């Protein structure tokens, strides 16, 4: 049997690279199908952009952020938070954009 191994638990991994300029990759694990949202926030808690908002199958996922807001405009250098919500799982991590 050639079954793909699935994650055993939800996880949001550190951004790579971090610090970054101008692109970073955000990886996350889904042990089961879930409604997933992955959003970027500034340190004031304002949503900068939303990268994912869909139902996804179980597996290892990755999405890139190119340091732009929801209107496609470049954001300022600084610290940003990225948060995943998948089912009941919620996790937030920090990343740093250098200019």
Label each region the model flagged.
Residues 52-87:
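Short, surface-exposed loop/turn motifs with a glycine/proline- and acidic-biased composition
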Residues 89-93:
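Extracellular and select intracellular beta-sandwich modules with Ser/Thr-enriched
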Residues 42-43, 69:
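Short, acidic, Ser/Thr-enriched surface-loop or helix-capping motifs
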Residues 46-52:
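Surface-exposed loop/edge segments in extracytoplasmic proteins
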Residues 1-16, 20-41, 50, 62-65, ...:
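Glycine-centered coil/turn sites that cap beta-strands in beta-rich domains
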Residues 54, 95-99:
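Short beta-strand edge segments in extracellular beta-sheet folds
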């Amino acid at each position: 049997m050639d079954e793909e191994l699935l994650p055993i638990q939800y996880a949001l991994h550190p951004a790579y690279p971090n610090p970054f300029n101008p692109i970073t990759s955000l990886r996350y694990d889904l042990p089961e199908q879930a409604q997933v949202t992955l959003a970027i926030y500034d340190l004031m808690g304002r949503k900068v952009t939303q990268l994912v908002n869909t139902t996804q199958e179980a597996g290892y996922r990755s999405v890139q952020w190119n340091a732009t807001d929801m209107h496609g405009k470049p954001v300022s250098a600084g610290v940003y938070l990225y948060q995943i919500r998948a089912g009941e799982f919620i996790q937030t991590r920090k990343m740093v954009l250098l200019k």
